[in-house]
Amino acid sequence: MRIALGIEYDGTHYYGWQRQREVKSVQEALEKALSKIANHPVEVQCAGRTDAGVHGTGQVVHFDTTAERQMVAWTMGANANLPKDIAVRWAMAVPDEFHARFSATARRYRYVIYNHVYRPGILNSGVSHYHGELDVEKMQQAGQYLLGENDFTSFRAVHCQSRSPWRNVMHLNVTRHGRYVVIDIKANAFVHHMVRNITGSLIAVGRGEQKPEWIQWLLAQKDRTLAAATAKAEGLYLVSVDYPAHFGLPEMPIGPLFLPDNLN
């Protein structure tokens, strides 16, 4: 039997999603909890492997099990055995052809910046902080140059293992909500550090160091060394993953925190 789960987590105290030796990972904690419910070792496959410090409100995983349990056992039981910073939001049986990664048609991320002269005290690990003024209109204008199918070498980590730098960005919106600036980006997939590298360069535009057209120029150069520094992990969230409708996966509020689904 194959089961899909929706997962939410605070990535602050983890070395990323992927299981690794001798360090804490979200995957390892989830697999341990599910294995207790299943009474056999469980290995999960995820929609997107997030880096150290990155959060998730819309991560999707699947696993195979021989255990016969009601869906509530996978949600309530797993949550009872998980650390407080990881939670299962939903569970459902899926056909064997469903795959959390390969069946996905798009991933969506949100990067949240606390834009105020003083750093936050409560949400310091859930948002990034920038103290200077940010021109959100110019950031929004700059982001539109990244729409469509492009070679994202300029926004790709040097050690990225993806075979191709080409990705299709479906939307990229930058909006202000009081002291918070949110970068909302959706693509078929992302190369390593793509959202954080784009964010770093959009911040350079927002603070007046570069013009919006610089982003278009960067894209054409296909040179990571010309772009701005990678933005911090703290403000980044994997908020949703799209799948073909026939799988019937639940639709949940994407957040994070106080943010509505529609930011416009």
Swiss-Prot record:
CDD domains the UniProt entry points to: PseudoU_synth_EcTruA
Keywords annotated in UniProt: Isomerase, tRNA processing
Pfam families: PseudoU_synth_1
Protein residues bound to substrate: 109
GO biological process: tRNA pseudouridine synthesis
rRNA processing recorded as keyword: no
Residues at the active site: 51 (nucleophile)
InterPro entries: PsdUridine_synth_cat_dom_sf (IPR020103), PsdUridine_synth_TruA (IPR001406), PsdUridine_synth_TruA_a/b_dom (IPR020097), PsdUridine_synth_TruA_C (IPR020095), TruA/RsuA/RluB/E/F_N (IPR020094)
GO MF terms held by the record: pseudouridine synthase activity; RNA binding; tRNA pseudouridine(38-40) synthase activity
Domain of life: Bacteria
Entries under SUPFAM superfamilies matching the protein: Pseudouridine synthase
The keyword Isomerase belongs to this UniProt entry's keyword annotation: yes
E.C. number(s) listed in UniProt: 5.4.99.12
Catalytic activity: uridine(38/39/40) in tRNA = pseudouridine(38/39/40) in tRNA
Record's function text: Formation of pseudouridine at positions 38, 39 and 40 in the anticodon stem and loop of transfer RNAs.
NCBIfam families: hisT_truA
Family as reported in the entry's similarity comment: Belongs to the tRNA pseudouridine synthase TruA family.
Assembly and binders: Homodimer.
Protein name: tRNA pseudouridine synthase A
Annotated organism of origin: Vibrio cholerae serotype O1 (strain ATCC 39315 / El Tor Inaba N16961)
